[in-house]
Amino acid sequence: MKKFAFLTALFAACYLPNAYAHALYVFAQYDGQTLSGKSYYSDMTPAAETYLEVFRSGVSDPVLTGKTDRQGVFKLSIADVPHTTLKVVVEGDEGHRASVVAAHTSAENQSGADLMLLREDIAHLKDKIYLHDILGGIGYIVGIAGLIALRNARKIKQGRI
């Protein structure tokens, strides 16, 4: 029975990180007239033709619904309401769901396209899986296995097994 529990725990530890490996991400900005953004998966492929809903703060029904294009980009016209925030919820394939509060930007100072490219670069860097993340996960698993081995060695030394 102990062997089965150990193998089950080992299997779960090895394959549960894969559930996070294909997450859905979204970023959005709102300039008072246009809500624009992009949706993509953790492997940086665009979330093409996924459905999205836009919610205002304090309202439970969506104000606007839409769909991303083949590059995962969306651009929706929406009237400005002062002192409110917009929340974008994207529903992708296989039950993936992501939401973000759209950042309110000023369209006067910068070009919307330039600001969108900058936000996209920042989002990609933030959501990318780096080598140190992978090595940290492996180290975590090896550390847990070491603690289990230490516990078993103490039991053997004390003669309880």
From Swiss-Prot:
UniProt entry keywords in alphabetical sequence: Membrane, Signal, Transmembrane, Transmembrane helix
CC per GO annotation: membrane
Stated name of the protein: Uncharacterized protein HI_1622
Membrane topology qualifier: Single-pass membrane protein
Bilayer-crossing regions: 129-149
This protein's record includes keyword Transmembrane helix: yes
Top-level taxon: Bacteria
Main location, first listed in the record: membrane
Location relative to the cell: Membrane
Signal peptide as annotated in the record: 1-23
